[in-house]
């Protein structure tokens, strides 16, 4: 039987100013869908997998072709509906409505489990969209670099007097998200030892300059770390190995007086025990075969390995090493496997990122549909021009230009908040209008943002008012972005932490240089981050309440206005 998800063809987004669709409002989602499957972008494009275990861009190759064909013929008064990667309908709407509305992997809560999802997936009735895979705004590993960088910098501020020079970070996973860690660490001034069980992943990160060196033994990797930290250099090494073995071994060596990491985290694809985590002692080839032949055994073995992995992380924490969960739900699995103390160490959002979320600051990103890197460099300069006092942001943009290799369509990410997003979006649109840019740009974000996600083990962990699991907020965010006129809007379940543990929404808007686009940008790029300020103000955070007042938000049930 032919696998409808396998195809050896190579997909790359069109470049330049020529349209393949009827307008830029439909050309933009077409190009970004194709860009998600570019071999320089996606982790496993032949299987439609973009990143994050089995995060896909379309349900099957037939669905991909139908989506692409529909986008090419869609008018400016029609909207395409996509249900878990399948184009299910086209309906008459209006010019300011989204051109695409996407819902991926959503399940009624009682049935929101990996077992039930995997049954549906096997029958061809569902698709796991992760966050930006099924919403067509993945820009490669750069997409999470700055968030990881901000986390490491803040950890340095809190634990090491503001400097990570001569320090080293231990982590696991070099997939589409985890691959950001070594580069983010180096940008923050630290060394990084990243454990990865699939050698092709290490090689991919070497090729795209996200990791500096490769090691095949722990001793070899530690020798590199020792040399670099003593010299005050910031460099990274990808170690071929299994984190469930390497982490406990490092604990053992640390307790015997050996090397001690300065920060410990992990970004393996532990959110998906069947597809995302290699059990201890298994080969990659064996894992691939048994996922099909004996999925229950794979999951059981992976979960047991994760427990060992987390036990080691808690041992580091107990020894005084700053340790953080980076949002892959590995603590939850370890607890379910009987390790009661799995949540001893915090998640990265409550530990380091939440004050940014309170001001609507999060992962603002844009991509140049022209395919020309110069368009991104020009927008970088515009960001600096419009944020003259923000030296931290300027330093980030300089480092990003120097260190980050573009994957697929040239793109940039920078964390900015309420007010700045709208100003930058309008400026980019004006640059398109004036011919400064060779083609329109799309502006979007990760679903990991201040107002667009409910994820009690990640973004909304330990909320001040206990509202961690309330998922009205991402639903309201998606509805408001739809009403505001985003070019495409998505609502997903299970991204980052897996089935049953998150709901989240995304939006993308196309800046094509028109006055219509400017009006939509003004609404969308104000309202979207404003929902994050609203959500955190409702939870009682003073920073968010002050921001809401300062920005003049009307929040009747919160501010009484």
Swiss-Prot record:
Organism: Rhizobium rhizogenes (strain K84 / ATCC BAA-868)
Record keywords, A-Z: Cytoplasm, Histidine metabolism, Lyase, NAD
Metabolic or biological pathway, per its Swiss-Prot or TrEMBL entry: Amino-acid degradation; L-histidine degradation into L-glutamate; N-formimidoyl-L-glutamate from L-histidine: step 2/3
PANTHER family, alphabetized: UROCANATE HYDRATASE
Role: Catalyzes the conversion of urocanate to 4-imidazolone-5-propionate.
Lyase in keyword set: yes
Membership in a protein family: Belongs to the urocanase family.
The name this protein goes by in its record: Urocanate hydratase
Entry cofactors: NAD(+)
């Amino acid at each position: 039987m032919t696998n409808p998800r396998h195809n050896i063809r190579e997909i790359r987004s069109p470049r330049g100013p020529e349209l393949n669709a009827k307008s830029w409002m439909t050309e933009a989602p077409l190009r970004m869908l194709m860009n998600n499957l570019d071999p320089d972008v996606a982790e496993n494009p032949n299987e439609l997998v973009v990143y994050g275990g089995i995060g896909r861009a379309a349900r099957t190759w037939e669905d991909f072709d139908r989506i692409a064909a529909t986008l090419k013929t869609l008018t400016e008064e029609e909207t395409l509906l996509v249900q878990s990667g399948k184009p299910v309908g086209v309906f008459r709407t209006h010019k300011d409505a989204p051109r695409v509305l996407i819902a991926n992997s959503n399940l009624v809560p009682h049935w929101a489990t990996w077992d039930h999802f995997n049954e549906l997936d096997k029958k061809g009735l569902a698709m796991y969209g992760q966050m930006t895979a099924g919403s067509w705004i993945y820009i490669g590993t750069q997409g999470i670099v700055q968030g990881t960088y901000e986390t490491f910098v803040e950890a340095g501020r809190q634990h090491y007097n503001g400097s990570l020079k001569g320090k080293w970070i231990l982590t696991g996973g070099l997939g589409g998200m985890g691959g950001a860690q070594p580069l983010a660490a180096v940008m923050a001034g630290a060394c990084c030892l990243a454990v990865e069980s699939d050698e092709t992943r290490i090689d991919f990160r070497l090729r795209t300059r996200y990791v500096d060196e490769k090691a095949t033994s722990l001793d070899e990797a530690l020798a590199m770390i020792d040399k670099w930290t003593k010299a005050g250099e910031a460099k990274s090494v990808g170690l071929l190995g299994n984190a469930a073995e390497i982490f406990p071994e490092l604990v053992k060596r640390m307790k015997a007086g050996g090397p001690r990491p300065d920060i410990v985290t992990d970004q393996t694809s532990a959110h998906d025990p069947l597809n995302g985590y290699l059990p201890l002692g298994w080969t990659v080839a064996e894992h691939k075969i048994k996922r099909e032949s004996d999925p229950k055994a794979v999951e059981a073995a992976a979960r047991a390995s994760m427990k060992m992995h987390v036990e080691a992380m808690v041992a580091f924490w107990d020894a005084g090493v700053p340790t953080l969960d980076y949002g892959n739900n590995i603590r939850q699995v370890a607890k379910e496997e009987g390790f009661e103390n799995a949540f001893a160490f915090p998640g990265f959002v409550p530990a380091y990122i939440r004050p940014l979320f309170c001001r609507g600051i999060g992962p603002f990103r844009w991509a140049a549909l022209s395919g020309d890197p110069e368009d991104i460099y020009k927008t970088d300069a515009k960001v600096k021009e419009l944020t003259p006092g923000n030296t931290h942001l300027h330093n980030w943009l300089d480092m990003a230009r120097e260190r980050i290799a573009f994957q697929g369509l040239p793109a940039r990410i920078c964390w900015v908040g309420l007010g700045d997003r709208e100003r930058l979006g309008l400026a980019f649109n004006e640059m398109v209008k004036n011919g400064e840019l060779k083609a329109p740009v799309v502006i979007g974000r990760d679903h990991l943002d201040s107002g667009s996600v409910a994820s009690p083990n990640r973004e909304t962990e330990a909320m001040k008012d206990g509202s961690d699991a309330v998922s009205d907020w991402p639903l309201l965010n998606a509805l408001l972005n739809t009403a505001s006129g985003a070019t495409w809007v998505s609502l997903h379940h299970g991204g980052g932490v897996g089935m049953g543990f998150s709901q989240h929404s995304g939006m993308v808007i196309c800046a094509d240089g028109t006055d219509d686009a400017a009006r939509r940008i003004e609404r969308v790029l104000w309202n979207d981050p404003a929902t994050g300020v609203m959500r955190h103000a409702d939870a009682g955070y003073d920073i968010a309440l002050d921001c809401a007042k300062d920005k003049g938000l009307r929040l009747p049930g919160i501010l009484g206005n």
